[in-house]
Regions:
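Bacterial N-terminal signal peptides that target proteins for export
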Residues: 1-2
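Extracytoplasmic/periplasmic ligand-capture domains
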Residues: 7-10, 14-34, 76-78, 95-96, ...
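Short aromatic-glycine motifs in intrinsically disordered, low-complexity regions
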Residues: 72-81, 140-141, 195-204, 364
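Surface-exposed binding/hinge segments that line
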Residues: 108, 142-192, 216
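Active-site-proximal polar cores
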Residues: 550
Length: 585
């Protein structure tokens, strides 16, 4: 049983997947599935896979793709509860795994686990994974998972102890979930620090303990996996081979599963209801949806993305010399939010899988604030007044407001997707009504979410004024997610040139007040108090208009009706239990 500090888990709202109609059994299969008995499995991830090292990845699609190979100590299940993967059991105070003072957590590892190359998995690999990510020169994109960790110790080959700098009310961040799996020390030993990006073989074909191993990888195109002969569960995985093909768009992925049946699984179907509903009616496949904490938002760039700045473009500096010329004004940010009609957006573009929201932490219900709901009502005239009173006026009659020679002209970027382009068009219209000129840019999704350090078009580079994407917490406790807005000493948590733009604070917002409140939150044990502090952190983000939350989204994918075993998950990788997937019998 969990101790009382984890009662927050009981407050999570229900989430689940659609029930598929019973299809005809697949012919020529053994009565009982075994390892590699069910042939090939095909998937479309229209945001193509860029890298398979989750610590260098910046997009959900890459974390999912890596999760077939690399495993954490524990996954988070569809209800948000931790379940053992490489760990023997979930550590708690009751079983002695979590210390009474909450300053350490100890995992006992499963025995006789092998890497896919046949080498034994040990606690040394866990320790190395921490050392790899926290190395100051490693551009580790998920370092916030190790926030507050002071030491990771191999007590013996099958026991690892994690020590925190203060009581950790939610100690399950490090090494758990898709963002924090274990990598092999032997393979990555020479890939530490500045060398991390140079290890192309390790980063595209990691050796893992999971049900599959990489057979072929072509960046931004295709990944082919084959079953791992050393996987510890003797009759898994059931599919002999898995192919993840990239490219196209969400509607095309939906069509390939639901209309033509040529693909088994289509991920992230951000498709308008009017388009996807007729496909579902054909009865070939099923839409799987679940609700966690995913929020579509417009992020504000607090730094100047002007190309004329060269190496300082969108680069945070402690002295504020690269601050954004007009988005640094909170009145401008607030006016942009006031001008948006989130209800129209939700109704037209999302249907039952999306609700308007003013919070970046929109779920689970226990941590959802009600302090920002004024944004649910569009206020165009109020936005105009706010800009006028702040000195932003259209003095030359060209329809664009200006102040001190600076015009309100915004470059608004996002990934290529019909729903996102229609969202852009709506927002462009609403912003132009208040005197803000808006240019739209869309980038191929595999590039936008790819994290290529050589590309100027990745969302972590953020070379636009605002950008739009969806994100949310990866467990029912949002501590790791909320760490994404920490500034830290010398801006260490901010994505900037010195870390290859690979930290998690993409907006480049730096608030000592937020950092101090987060420290209090991280040290608070009582679940009700933690929930209130999580709301306060959300409110600081919302009321400073660090980003503009738009839609509280469900995760939506589709599977062909001959596929079973899927347990749709919004708190972790959708492929977290892929070893159990099989053909219907």
């Amino acid at each position: 049983l969990f101790s009382t500090i984890f009662i927050l888990a009981l407050l999570v709202g229900a989430c689940g997947s659609a029930d598929a109609p019973a299809p005809a059994a697949s012919p020529d299969l053994p009565a009982t599935p075994g390892r590699a008995t069910d042939g090939p499995l095909s998937m479309i991830y229209w945001q193509a896979i860029s890298v398979l090292n989750p610590y260098l990845a910046t997009g959900t699609k890459d974390w999912h793709a890596a999760s077939l190979v690399l495993e954490p100590l524990m996954w988070f299940d569809p209800d948000g509860f931790p379940v053992p993967a490489l760990a023997n059991e979930v550590p708690t105070i009751e079983n002695g795994g979590v210390s009474e003072d909450l300053t350490s957590i100890t995992y006992t590892l499963k025995e006789d686990v092998l890497w896919s190359d046949g080498n034994p998995f040990t606690a040394d690999d866990v320790v190395f994974t921490w050392e790899y990510c926290v190395n100051p020169e490693t551009p580790c994109s998920t370092i916030s998972n190790f926030e507050g960790v002071t030491n990771v110790e191999a007590v013996n080959p099958l026991t690892v102890r994690i020590t925190f700098d203060a009581p950790a009310a939610f100690p399950y961040g490090p090494f758990n979930g898709q963002l924090s799996p274990i990598i092999q020390k032997t393979q990555f030993a020479d890939c530490m620090g500045a060398k991390a990006q140079e290890c192309s073989e390790a980063n595209t074909a990691p050796i893992g303990t999971g049900p599959y191993k990489v057979k072929e990888f072509r960046a931004n195109d295709i990944v082919v996996y084959e079953s791992n002969p050393n996987f510890r569960i003797a009759d898994q995985p059931h599919f002999a081979e898995v192919t993840i093909k990239g490219g196209g768009d969400a509607a095309g992925a939906a069509r390939a599963v639901l209309e033509t049946g040529e693909v088994d699984w289509g991920w992230n179907l951000q498709v308008e209801p009017a388009i996807i509903n007729p496909m579902v009616e054909k009865g070939i496949g099923t839409v799987y949806s679940s609700r966690g904490g995913l929020v579509e938002r417009i992020s504000i760039n607090f730094t100047n993305p002007d190309p004329a700045l060269g190496d300082n473009r969108s680069n945070w500096t402690a002295d504020g010399s690269t601050a954004h010329p007009f988005l640094s004004d909170i009145n401008v940010r607030q006016a942009l939010s006031m001008a948006i009609d989130r209800s129209v957006m939700a109704k037209q573009l999302y249907g039952f899988v999306g609700d308007p929201t003013c919070n970046v932490v929109a779920g689970p219900p226990a941590v959802a604030s009600t302090a920002n709901n004024e944004c649910l009502v569009q206020d165009t005239e109020g936005a105009k007044r706010l800009l006028e009173e702040s000195g932003w006026v259209d003095s030359d009659g060209d329809g664009v407001r200006e102040k001190d020679g600076v015009e309100l002209r915004i470059l608004y970027a996002t990934a290529t997707n019909p729903v996102r382009q229609k969202t852009q068009a709506l927002v462009q219209q609403w912003w132009e009504e208040i005197g803000v000129a808006t240019d739209l840019k869309n980038v191929e999704a595999g590039v936008f979410f790819g994290g290529d350090p050589a590309s100027p078009d990745t969302f972590n580079k953020f070379f636009s004024d605002v950008q739009m994407f969806a994100n949310g917490p990866d467990s029912i406790d949002p501590q790791t997610y909320l760490a994404g807005w920490l500034c830290g000493p010398d801006g260490e948590n901010i994505a900037k040139a010195s870390n290859n733009f690979n930290a998690q604070n993409y907006e480049r917002w730096c608030s000592p007040e937020y950092d101090a409140l987060f420290a209090e939150y991280a040290a608070t044990k009582e679940p009700e108090a933690r929930a209130e502090l999580a709301k306060q952190l959300n409110d600081l983000i919302a009321q400073n208009y660090v980003n503009l939350p738009l839609i509280f989204r469900g995760d939506v994918s589709a599977g062909i009706n001959t596929l079973t075993g899927v347990r749709m998950n919004s708190w972790d990788s959708q492929l977290w239990n892929i070893g159990e997937w099989q053909r219907v019998r």
